[in-house]
Each structure stands twice: as C-alpha cells, then as structure tokens.
C-alpha cells in the first residue's frame, strides 16, 4: 500500500464506493473504534461521506480487543497485528471463528507451510492482499461462520447449478 499510495494522491475514480450509507457508517465505526483504542493510521484514513468512499487504509498497533478484528470488514481497511512467535499467531487464528481470508506475509517457506497446515480459512494470499479473490481460476468462499461453498469461474457455475444424476438399468 505504501508503494502504491506513497505520494498521498489517489485518483478518485480508482476508489470503490461502499455499497450504502449504513455500511459506510459501519466501516467508519470500525475505523473510529480502532483509532480510539490506540491503533495507528499508517496509510490512508480518509473517508468521504458525500460519495461513500474510503481510501485504502492500513492500521498498525491493532489489538484483539478491537472490533475491527472481530468482524469481517468488506472495505479497504487493513488491520495489522504483530507477534513474538509463530505459534502465537497460529493459536490466535485457531481459537476464533474461521476467517474468510488469511493474509500471510513471510519469506520463510517453512513458516508459511506451518500456518497453512495448522489453520483453516476461506482463502489465503501470501505476501499480498485480496489476490486470491481477484484470481478467477481460484475458488472463493468461506468456511463455517464465514460462509460455505466456493464461487468464481467454474466453481460458481457448479455451486449454483444442479447436476442431475440419471442412472438407467439396461434390460
């Protein structure tokens, strides 16, 4: 995000609108709650209520008690938590509802594999954000509380189609 928006200038047409005022207020409330509890705005943080836009925003110094880490956001807000060891991260993920998406930032393949083998989530992007959703050749969907089934491309076609089995005995 810092590389993309380092000059602070984002063209208005490149920012997606939040679907309606109710959801805009929900997203703004998640942001305000996090900042009020000590989160730091590392990038972004601009909200425009007149056209319901939110600039891509990264929050650091985020804690598990903040509402932003307890709900699915569905907006360009990226809360970032730090940790002391990998087992701490895995435990954090395991004791909560399965997330719709999991973003892993690491150059260490063994750490990435350890997280993947010990956690469950909808989709995963390694060293990026949202890419698994944007790739139509990959299924997209959640697990348990975050949804069921897979969508996108052929996966969505199959999910919303009924395959009718017919077995005919030959006399």
Q: Where do the protein language model's features map onto the residues?
A:
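Conserved C-terminal structural/oligomerization subdomain of aldehyde/semialdehyde dehydrogenase
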Residues: 2, 46, 53-171
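ALDH superfamily catalytic-core signature
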Residues: 1-63, 86-87, 91, 126
């Amino acid at each position: 995000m810092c590389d993309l928006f380092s000059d602070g200038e984002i063209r208005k047409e490149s920012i997606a609108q939040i679907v309606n005022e109710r959801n805009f207020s929900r997203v703004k409330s998640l942001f305000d709650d996090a900042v009020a509890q000590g989160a730091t705005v590392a990038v972004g943080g601009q909200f425009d209520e007149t056209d319901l836009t939110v600039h891509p925003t990264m929050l650091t110094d985020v804690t598990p008690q903040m509402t932003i880490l307890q709900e699915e956001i569905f907006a360009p807000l990226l809360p970032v938590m730090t940790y002391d060891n990998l087992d701490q991260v895995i435990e954090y993920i395991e004791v909560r509802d399965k997330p719709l998406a999991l973003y892993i930032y690491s150059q260490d393949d063994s750490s990435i594999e350890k997280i993947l083998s010990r956690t469950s989530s909808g989709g995963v992007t390694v060293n990026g954000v949202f890419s698994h959703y944007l790739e139509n050749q990959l299924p997209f969907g959640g697990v348990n509380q975050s949804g069921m089934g897979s969508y996108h491309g052929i996966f969505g076609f199959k999910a919303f189609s009924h395959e009718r089995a017919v077995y005919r005995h030959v006399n």
